[in-house]
Structure formats: structure tokens, C-alpha cells
Amino acid sequence: MDQSNRYADLTLTEEKLVADGNHLLVAYRLKPAAGYGFLEVAAHVAAESSTGTNVEVSTTDDFTRGVDALVYEIDEAAFGDKGGLMKIAYPVDLFDPNLIDGHYNVSHMWSLILGNNQGMGDHEGLRMLDFLVPEKMVKRFDGPATDISDLWKVLGRPEVDGGYIAGTIIKPKLGLRPEPFAKACYDFWLGGDFIKNDEPQANQNFCPMEVVIPKVAEAMDRAQQATGQAKLFSANVTADFHEEMIKRGEYVLGEFAKYGNEKHVAFLVDGFVTGPAGVTTSRRAFPDTYLHFHRAGHGAVTSYKSPMGMDPLCYMKLARLMGASGIHTGTMGYGKMEGHNDERVLAYMLERDECQGPYFYQKWYGMKPTTPIISGGMDALRLPGFFENLGHGNVINTCGGGSFGHIDSPAAGGISLGQAYACWKTGAEPIEAPREFARAFESFPGDADKIFPGWREKLGVHK
């Protein structure tokens, strides 16, 4: 059934929709299935995402029609064989405020703008490319309670432009028992700032939380005494049940508090698999604790290889609305994860109060920033190029292999990361860097050959 007479109005202008502030706007890439018209399918998406049914129903009234989602712009040839561009305006009244406080929730918003429309049979691809949240909605999402300035404060740095936080993931990601896990933490903390659990590290029988966390808390205290520097740990509290997440969080904070280090703790939540409910549980139950959003599994909906799902930029915006203090953004083409240089807009959208996306100019109206967390195949040699592309180093970076694969020690690996940042910031020649960074060339010769050809001769190292 062609519903374009009701669910499309191409006379609407984006300028007026934005100025009125009564709609959430979404840009999609759409490829209709064979035998279907572009506007016909676009209108079906708007109908399926709002008030529509596959037939006319007698219960529809004038108010219902007043909250129809409307297609307001199309360009059938925008992406060639991959499909065309369409934009839909969703009335704010369609979205769901909480009973307890009137805040909007991402779960409902997501189910509406990228829910049943993903399973429609009359398209071969429907991908969300960008969306614009109006002021009246932005101000009623939780947003972050803490941000990177809170971590800089713990580290004794300026709370504005406090710089790069050198971190790692304990490797191997699974299989370490409590004692070697805590030792690995201590060894890295002698040179680096920040350690996170990897996404599957939690409460396995071979490394129970109630055994390993006390040892990690003690290792942090020893490392701080040995170095005279504050250290940070991001503990995985992900679980299916909100009470279990809270139990884990309270336990972790209690163990680190024995050394006065509860402010040195972040909570890692696997936000894709546990969903907005898990993220919000941590955000609201522990508003003083940095909320570290790990996106494991996100590629199922964000991979550029898919005609479905959403672009990573949309996922970043959803995470900020949920209240993530920091989220993994990938490595923008400099590590092992799927991505490209222009993904620096992901970081800008997270950290700035206003940012131009691919289709919409988003204002955040004072919402706290979300930190870009850079992870996945990075090491000291890859960092200068990454910083140059991004334009700053106010990020958390976790290098697992890039730290524990350093030829000298995990501590040297951590030191080399900080030296890479200092080298980029001062414009120093990497080949002439201090020892730990210089030894990274020998630690990761494959990267060195690609990024710094001729390094062997300059350092006097031969194959």
C-alpha cells in the first residue's frame, strides 16, 4: 500500500523544521527492493516508525494524524547503486519520557527511529546516517555525569586541556588468574596511567572478582607509592540484572576505598550488549564514577560493510545522550579496527558543544562531553599520525599489545605512549625520541617499516 499521500510532505523545509524545534530529524540511506518506488518505501518507513499500519484502520483520528512522521526530503540517486537519501521528521510528541523524572530514554527513541523499519520487506537496505535532536529533547536526556576533566583532576593535571591518558588492556584478554593479572597491572602502572578490563574480563571461575579486585587495588596503591603518580582502573561491571551491576560496582569501590582510591576507579559497561538500560543503571547508580562505555558487538549494526543499521556517528550520539563519560570510537584508520581518517568527526561530536555532522548541525546545549577512547591495534608508533589527524591528544588510549608487546617491559610500553604524545605535541623527530619510544621501533618493526621507512639505518638497527 502506497502511503506517500499521508506520510510524505516534500514541501516542508529543513530550515523551518529546525527553527521550530518540534521534530527529531533523521537522515537515512534507502535502497528499495525490486518493484517498489523510492518515495513509496520511504513513506512506508515513516509510517512503520510512527503511526502507520499496513492497512487503513478505523481508530485513526485527527490527533493521530498530527503526530505522523513525515518524509520531507529525498534524493533517489544520492548513493548510486547503494540507494538514495531520505530524511524523516519525527514529532517530539512521539517520544517517551520517564514516569519517574520526565527524562527521555534512548531505548524508546532507538526502537522508533531504527526499529521495525529494519525488517521491512520492501527495501534491500535502510541505514541511519545522522540525526538531529532538538533542544527541548537534548535537555531532557541524562547525558554524562562525569567526564575526562574528573580523571585529569585525579591525575593532578589541569582540568582543561589536561592531555593524553596513556592506558592499556591487560593481555591476554582471558586466561590470567588473579596473581598474574594483578602483577600485569602493577608492571604497566610503573609507566602508564590507565588500565581497563577487556570486555569479557569479569568474574570467571579462574579469576573471580572477589579475589582479583583486592589484588588490583593493592597493586594500584603500590604503583602509586613507587612512582609518586596517581593511577586509574576501569572495572567491568556489566551484567544482565541491574542489581548485579550495582553489587559489582559497590564491591569494586569498596575495595579501592580501602586505600583511599575510590575516585581512581571507572566502571566499564559493555553498552551494546547490555543496552541503554545497563548504561543508565551505571550512570544513575554511580553518578560520581566515570562511565566507560565499551561498544563490543557494535559492528553488527555500525559496520560500513552493511546496508542496514547505523553509521558509527549515530551510535556516538546515542551514547552521549545515554550518559557515557567515555566511549570507544575506534582508531580512525590508524589501528586494526574498521574505520577511516574522517572519523575524527566522531570525536568532535562527542567532545564539543556544537558540531557539524554529515547532514545536521547538532547543538548539545551545555551537556557534558563524552571522551573519545582510542583502542584496537595501537602502539607508540601509530600515535603521532593519529594525533595529527585528530588535532589534539585529549583522549584515553588503551594499547594492549602496544604496551605488553614492548621489547623492554610493560612499563616501558606505557612510557613510550606518553613519549609519543609529547613527541607529537612538541614537533620532535620520532627517531630522536627518548629510549622507550625509540625501542618501540624494535618492538613493532612491521609498523616501523610502514610508518617510518629508513628507521633501521637511523637507529643503527639491522634486520
Swiss-Prot record:
Cytoplasm keyword on record: no
E.C. no: 4.1.1.39
Triggers of expression: mRNA expression is constant at all CO(2) concentrations tested, however more protein accumulates at 15% and 2% CO(2) than at 0.15% and 0.03% CO(2) (at protein level).
Catalytically driven reaction(s): 2 (2R)-3-phosphoglycerate + 2 H(+) = D-ribulose 1,5-bisphosphate + CO2 + H2O; D-ribulose 1,5-bisphosphate + O2 = 2-phosphoglycolate + (2R)-3-phosphoglycerate + 2 H(+)
Keywords linked to the UniProt accession: Calvin cycle, Carbon dioxide fixation, Lyase, Magnesium, Metal-binding, Monooxygenase, Oxidoreductase
Domain of life: Bacteria
Transmembrane segments: none
Cofactor detail note: Binds 1 Mg(2+) ion per subunit.
Main enzyme class: lyase
Residues the record marks as site: Transition state stabilizer: 336
Required co-factors: Mg(2+)
InterPro entries reported in the protein's UniProt record: RuBisCO, RuBisCo_large_chain_AS, RuBisCO_lsu_C, RuBisCO_lsu_C_sf, RuBisCO_lsu_fd_N, RuBisCO_lsu_N_sf, RuBisCO_lsuII
Entry GO MF terms: magnesium ion binding; monooxygenase activity; ribulose-bisphosphate carboxylase activity
PTM sites of type N6-carboxylysine: 196
GO biological process: reductive pentose-phosphate cycle
Coiled coil ranges: none
Other comment: The basic functional RuBisCO is composed of a large chain homodimer in a 'head-to-tail' conformation. In contrast to form I RuBisCO, the form II RuBisCO are composed solely of large subunits.
Summary of the function given for this chain in its UniProt record: RuBisCO catalyzes two reactions: the carboxylation of D-ribulose 1,5-bisphosphate, the primary event in carbon dioxide fixation, as well as the oxidative fragmentation of the pentose substrate. Both reactions occur simultaneously and in competition at the same active site.
Quaternary context: Homodimer.
Family membership: Belongs to the RuBisCO large chain family. Type II subfamily.
Protein name per Swiss-Prot or TrEMBL: Ribulose bisphosphate carboxylase
Record organism: Hydrogenovibrio marinus
Lineage: Bacteria, Pseudomonadati, Pseudomonadota, Gammaproteobacteria, Thiotrichales
Gene it is expressed from: cbbM
